[in-house]
């Protein structure tokens, strides 16, 4: 060191310390790697100082003492954040560059600057056993990979000073980052570098002659030296443990392919670029079996690469300056590239899918965003996509960080290949080259990807096209955000995405020819998997559960029209009737109506205890599901819990609940009268339409085979199908179900509805619960593993027959929607061998008291219930038979508590009873406003739609029931059958009642068909005893006379008579200014078989009187003067009690007696409630003969519609 420092005696003490540090670094890091005979440490340190001073550009008297020399090992170990360092930048220059970079991409910050001095040897990694065709900076402490904008093969093995560089670390512990060498390195060693071309340069063969040589028969192993312009630089490939890359040299119209496969030459790929002229010596001629014996050139151990440069530039500086390049191919702009050929084709399997050819272009741009590093997707210039998936994965992203400028050659341009990617996407194939022309000055996180990621494996295994791959990446990102890691492990995300792709694409659409990579790299004209692409296919969007809920609520509330919710009689309703009619409404939308493109919904089915429903959920939200089967069977298996499913067809239902105080229908356009509104959004699903992406662990082999047979289960290939089959197989063979347990086999007899039950006598706490009655098929059994839903063993059938009561409380209420009478279940208690935990306990009888109840068993939250796919022969019993609506109406032996099935034809929300408080407030998390919600369902017979029964439900007594909308098939359990004073049968709910929807016409049967018209009835038949429960029918007859006609204006608030502009109520006075017009007429209708009294309400009176709109409005104005007019039949004329001589009364009397009113009429009527009366005796004259006949009471009907034709 003294010898070295003697050359710098005039320097300051600070300079001396810095020089000492340089000497120690040279002695420790670089001297051990050099030949001891070549250089002394002092001479090498002297050369380092000179190169540093020259790089700084300052006076030789100044040294960069602020820069600390750093070794490679220190850089890797200590530098945990990205940084940059430059010897030639001033502070002002750095700030200007940083500001300019941040203005280009405002979301990123510039790389922080560190004053570090980096020196090392450039090598290709062979010394470290890491020869992967990359440059590395090496010293005695280790090596780190690096990237350069331009490099020369003459730099290999030389000691270099790196003036300007960026270091990008990895976040993984123990992993090294990489260097970005911004400026060319400066050679420190000055030894002469001799160039061995490996052959005489005077024998350089042109590309045209080389192509002719390969075309004609020649001996293999012939060595030639070829010079030409590089037109293709292929990626470095690893095939069967061997690395190689492809170069294509061109000259004029001729080209020749070179395969570089020697380990020591693989760094050449970093030294050449498209457009550069090179010579390569000692190339051998060989044949490729993959190309049917086609001859190509390959390198040998003696081959050398030499760039073509003028001779006068051969000097020391030539080694570190940029190589001379000839102009590259014309670089296309985005506007030029979008002018793609207009011709396209169609897929044979789907004529709606267009297939277009891609265009090969060159492009230059700036990386603005990393869309998906694992998928190799980037964004250029804010609008163009770049995909590198069809090339081998580059380490560290190939330096493609936001802000980097790149040059692309021989890339494929596609336009609108996918709806989930930029419109214009550039694709790099095995013939494309990606060259960085300027490193990014911005700080961005390094996203490290595996060399062979799951997405790339799927791409290669299934030979996907560009459009399919973009859709696969879209699914992979969506699944990772919404389902991982709770339901889908991170390493299985791509597998799930692949299954989704299989579900969307048909087998014919996915199958392509086997790839030949040598043909893709070498053969002309070029053809590869990217040469043809589908336009925007697959186009199915994968929505999250929250996205669907938000869209549904926004769509329904924004399109809310209050007049559309009301019937035609809305102008005649009082405020109480109007507001009651607005309390509830529902909207049904199909999933395909949410978007012009197909929609998919992906989620996990889980049982929810708070609402006792099946839910579809992901990380964003959860959505209640009303699940039915196509055969209207209610038997939803417990194995669906935990299944990852894809929903392609379903109906979105939103039930709206509003509290309003509109004075009249004229105020419906004023939303201020709406005091409260909220909604319930849920899905109507048909289980047969679900695609099982990942089955639950308890899904049995028999169920999976049944689904596969009917084509409803997703079939996947390769590893996906193997996992599906293994997951669907019987769980008895699974090795991970090793917990000891006990089980009990039972068949469910019946179950009660979910209600709030007292937990203990000491507190007033109540919780949800329900009770079931079951018959034990066998005794309690011990297991060494969890049997789940495997086949029933013989030992489980011993000792059965006991009837027990099963009590479900708290979180156990979640089993309610999957427990069905008549089905067999296995109850399992894990982690115990005590059979007593599943034995039902009874109450001991004392004092001669007879015990009527069965032994009971309270289920624990950790216990599991599994539906068994088959029933044992000794326990088979049909589910309790349900009555039909006809049997409920007509059966004389019907019990007081009945269960029946039918179809909802009407739902009416009953008027709110302000005096009565709700018995039990709803505990559903979204149903806090469903207090005092009582509805009347009109349920019609499935076989005879004319037979109907009213069911009154108090929905505030338990959990809210989903799906009670018109057209739904349902089963009503445990309701009380009652007979009114008018001898009409109706039903009302009990605390143990429950309603289960078993069929949804809009889901299982496609678009809902128009309801069949009511049957045509004769009045005599309708009045008979056998048809008394036909509620709605069509009748044709003659209007004999009008019995009464009442026209009135009443106050919409209190119902009193309204005269002109004031309400007639005086005690207490009413100051309302809103009035509604009401009309009612009662006529005698006769059809030859009988007669009926038909009532016409406000909206149908006008049609009965045959008045047009102007006449009807004028009549209303005249009536408003008096407020009330009523005429009725007395003898053969019509009169009025108040003023029979009034002009209005005389007009109405004349009108009601006219032939325009007493005419043939065709009406649809609903039967009114009427008491059973005695027959009346009347005198009937036939000529001179008088008869006394017995006439039954007239049939009372309410007109619903007057048919004009």
Swiss-Prot record:
Main location per the UniProt record: nucleus
GO molecular function list: single-stranded DNA binding; telomeric DNA binding
Keyword Nucleus belongs to the record: yes
UniProt-annotated location(s): Nucleus; Chromosome, Telomere
Cell wall biogenesis/degradation recorded as keyword: no
A GO cellular-component term linked to this record: CST complex
InterPro entries tied to this protein: CTC1, CTC1-like
Assigned keywords, A-Z: Chromosome, DNA-binding, Nucleus, Telomere
Bilayer-crossing regions: none
Xref: Pfam families: CTC1
Region annotation Disordered: where it falls in the sequence: 303-349
Biased composition annotated in UniProt, kind: Low complexity: 327-340
Gene Ontology biological process terms in this record: positive regulation of DNA replication; telomere maintenance via telomere lengthening
Subunit structure: Component of the CST complex.
Family statement: Belongs to the CTC1 family.
Function: Component of the CST complex proposed to act as a specialized replication factor promoting DNA replication under conditions of replication stress or natural replication barriers such as the telomere duplex. The CST complex binds single-stranded DNA with high affinity in a sequence-independent manner, while isolated subunits bind DNA with low affinity by themselves. Initially the CST complex has been proposed to protect telomeres from DNA degradation. However, the CST complex has been shown to be involved in several aspects of telomere replication.
Protein name: CST complex subunit CTC1
């Amino acid at each position: 060191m003294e010898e070295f420092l003697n050359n710098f005696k005039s320097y300051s003490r600070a300079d001396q310390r810095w020089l000492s540090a340089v000497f120690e670094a040279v002695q420790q890091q670089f001297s051990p790697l050099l030949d001891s005979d070549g250089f002394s440490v002092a001479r090498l340190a002297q050369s380092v100082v000179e190169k540093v001073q020259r790089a700084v550009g300052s006076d030789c008297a100044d040294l960069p003492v602020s820069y600390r020399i750093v070794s490679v090992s220190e850089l890797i170990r200590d530098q945990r954040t990205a940084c940059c360092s430059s010897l030639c930048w001033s502070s002002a220059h750095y700030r200007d560059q940083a500001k300019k970079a941040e203005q280009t991409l405002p979301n990123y910050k510039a790389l922080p600057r560190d004053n570090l001095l980096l020196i090392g040897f450039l090598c290709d990694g062979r010394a470290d056993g890491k020869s992967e065709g990359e440059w590395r900076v090496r010293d005695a402490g280790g090596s780190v990979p690096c990237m350069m904008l331009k490099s020369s093969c003459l730099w290999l093995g030389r000691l270099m000073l790196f003036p300007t560089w960026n270091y990008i670390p990895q976040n993984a512990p123990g992993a090294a980052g990489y260097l970005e060498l911004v400026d060319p390195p400066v050679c420190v060693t000055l030894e002469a570098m001799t160039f061995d071309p490996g052959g005489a340069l005077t024998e350089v063969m042109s590309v045209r002659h080389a192509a002719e040589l390969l075309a004609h028969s020649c001996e293999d192993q012939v060595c030639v030296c070829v010079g030409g312009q590089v037109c293709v630089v292929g990626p470095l490939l690893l095939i069967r443990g061997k690395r190689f890359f492809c170069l294509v040299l061109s000259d004029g119209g001729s080209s020749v392919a070179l395969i570089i496969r020697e380990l020591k030459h693989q760094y050449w790929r970093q030294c050449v670029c498209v457009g550069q002229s090179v010579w390569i010596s000692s190339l051998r001629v060989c044949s490729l079996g993959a190309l049917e014996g086609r001859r190509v050139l390959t390198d040998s151990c003696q081959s050398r690469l030499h760039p073509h440069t003028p001779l006068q530039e051969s000097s020391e500086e030539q080694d570190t300056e940029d190589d001379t390049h000839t102009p590259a191919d014309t670089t296309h702009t985005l506007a030029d590239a979008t002018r793609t050929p207009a011709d396209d084709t169609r897929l044979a399997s789907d004529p709606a899918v267009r297939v277009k050819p891609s265009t090969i272009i060159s492009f230059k741009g700036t990386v603005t965003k990393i869309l998906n590093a694992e998928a190799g997707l980037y964004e250029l210039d804010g609008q163009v996509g770049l995909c590198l998936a069809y090339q081998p994965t580059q380490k560290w992203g190939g330096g493609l960080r936001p802000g980097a400028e790149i040059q692309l050659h021989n890339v494929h341009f596609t336009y609108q290949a996918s709806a989930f990617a930029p419109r214009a996407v550039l694709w790099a194939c095995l013939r494309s080259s990606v060259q960085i022309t300027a490193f990014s000055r911005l700080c961005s996180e390094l996203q490290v990807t595996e060399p062979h990621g799951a997405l790339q494996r799927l791409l290669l295994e299934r030979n996907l096209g560009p459009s399919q791959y973009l859709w696969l990446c879209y699914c992979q990102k969506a699944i990772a955000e919404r389902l991982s890691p709770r339901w889908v492990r991170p390493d299985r995300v791509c597998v799930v995405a692949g299954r989704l792709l299989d579900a969307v694409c048909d087998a014919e659409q996915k199958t392509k020819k086997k790839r030949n990579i040598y043909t893709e790299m070498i053969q002309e004209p070029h053809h590869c998997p990217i040469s043809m692409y589908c336009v925007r296919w697959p186009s199915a969007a994968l929505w999250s559960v929250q996205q669907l809920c938000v869209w549904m609520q926004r769509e329904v509330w924004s399109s809310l029209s209050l007049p559309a919710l009301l019937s035609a009689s809305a102008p005649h309703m009082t405020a109480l009737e109007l507001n009651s009619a607005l309390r509830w409404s529902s909207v049904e939308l199909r999933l395909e109506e949410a978007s012009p493109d197909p929609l998919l919904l992906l989620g996990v089915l889980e049982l929810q205890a708070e609402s006792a429903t099946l839910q579809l959920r992901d990380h964003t939200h959860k959505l209640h599901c009303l699940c039915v089967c196509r055969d209207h069977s209610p038997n939803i298996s417990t194995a669906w819990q935990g299944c990852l499913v894809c929903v392609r067809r379903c109906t979105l239902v939103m039930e709206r609940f509003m509290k309003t105080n509109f004075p009249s229908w004229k105020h419906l356009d004023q939303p201020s009268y709406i005091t409260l509104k909220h909604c319930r959004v849920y899905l109507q699903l048909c289980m047969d339409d679900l695609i099982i992406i990942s089955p639950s662990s308890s899904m049995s082999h028999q169920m999976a085979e049944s689904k596969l047979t009917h084509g409803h289960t997703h079939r996947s290939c390769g590893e996906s199908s193997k996992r599906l089959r293994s997951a669907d197989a019987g769980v008895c063979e699974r090795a991970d179900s090793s917990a000891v347990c006990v089980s009990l086999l039972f068949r469910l007899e019946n179950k009660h509805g979910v209600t709030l039950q007292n937990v203990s006598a000491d507190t007033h706490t109540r919780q949800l619960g329900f009770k079931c009655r079951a018959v034990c098929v066998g005794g309690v059994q011990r297991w060494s593993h969890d049997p789940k839903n495997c086949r029933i063993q013989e030992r489980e059938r011993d000792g059965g027959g006991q009837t027990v009561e099963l009590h479900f409380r708290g979180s156990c209420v979640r089993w309610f929607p999957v427990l069905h009478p008549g089905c067999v279940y296995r109850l399992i208690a894990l982690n115990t061998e005590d059979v007593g935990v599943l034995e039902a306990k009874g109450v001991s009888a004392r004092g001669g008291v007879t015990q009527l109840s069965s032994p009971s068993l309270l289920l624990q939250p950790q216990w599991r219930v599994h539906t068994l796919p088959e029933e044992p022969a000794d326990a088979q019993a049909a589910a309790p038979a349900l009555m039909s609506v006809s049997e409920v109406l007509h059966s004389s032996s019907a019990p007081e508590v009945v269960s029946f099935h039918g179809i909802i034809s009407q739902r009416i929300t009953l008027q709110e009873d302000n005096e009565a408080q709700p018995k039990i407030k709803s505990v559903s998390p979204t149903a806090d406003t469903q207090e005092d919600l009582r509805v009347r369902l009109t349920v019609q017979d499935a076989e005879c739609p004319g037979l109907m029964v009213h069911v009154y439900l108090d929905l505030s007594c338990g959990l809210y029931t989903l799906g009670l909308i018109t057209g739904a098939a349902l089963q009503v359990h445990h309701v009380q059958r009652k007979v009114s004073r008018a001898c009409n049968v109706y039903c009302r709910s009990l605390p143990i009642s429950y309603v289960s929807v078993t069929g949804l016409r809009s889901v299982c049967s496609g678009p809902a068909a128009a309801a069949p018209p009511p049957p045509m009835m004769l009045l005599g038949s309708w009045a008979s005893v056998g048809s008394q429960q036909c509620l709605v029918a069509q009748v044709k007859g003659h209007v004999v006379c009008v019995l009464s006609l009442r026209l009135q204006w009443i106050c919409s608030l209190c119902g009193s008579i309204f005269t002109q502009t004031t309400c007639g109520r005086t005690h207490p006075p009413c100051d309302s200014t809103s009035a509604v017009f009401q009309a009612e007429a009662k006529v005698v209708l006769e059809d030859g078989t009988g007669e009926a009294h038909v009532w016409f309400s406000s909206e149908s009176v006008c049609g009965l009187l045959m008045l047009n709109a102007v006449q009807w409005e004028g009549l209303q104005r005249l009536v408003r003067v008096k407020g009330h007019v009523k005429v009725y039949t007395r003898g053969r004329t019509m009169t009025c009690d108040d003023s029979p001589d009034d002009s209005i009364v005389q007009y109405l009397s004349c009108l009601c007696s006219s032939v325009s009113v007493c005419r043939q009429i065709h009406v649809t009527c609903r039967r009114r409630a009427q008491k059973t009366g005695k027959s009346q005796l009347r005198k009937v004259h036939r000529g001179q003969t008088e008869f006394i006949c017995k006439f039954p009471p007239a049939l009372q009907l309410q007109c619903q519609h007057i048919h004009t034709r």
